Amino acid sequence: MTAPKPSKTHIGNHALHPETLMLNYGYDPQLSEGAVKPPVFLTSTFVFRTAEDGQDFFDFVSGRREPPEGTGAGLVYSRFNHPNSEIVEDRLSIYEKAEACILFS
C-alpha cells in the first residue's frame, strides 16, 4: 500500500466519523480526469516513462529496494498494486482505525 492520502478529518470543530471519512478518502479526482467518484480501472499493467523506471518500480514494489523518500512505489502490475485496491485499503484502514491495510485473495 502507498502512504494514505491526506484528507479532511474535521469540519470546523466537529470530527468526522470513519463512515463519513470512507466516502472520499484515498482518492484524488485530479488524478482521474476530475471524476467525482473513483473509476473502475480494468487493467493489470501500467505504463512507465522509461524501461529504467519500470525496473525501479518493480524493485520498489517487490521489496528489493526502498523508493526514494517521499515517493511511493508507483503502479506496476495488478498483482502487486492497483488503484482500486489502494483506495479500498486506504478506506478500510480509516474505518478500522488502523495504520495500514492490505487486500489479498
Regions found by a protein language model. Name each.
Residues 1-69:
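N-terminal glycine-rich, Lys/His-bearing helix-loop that initiates the first secondary-structure elements
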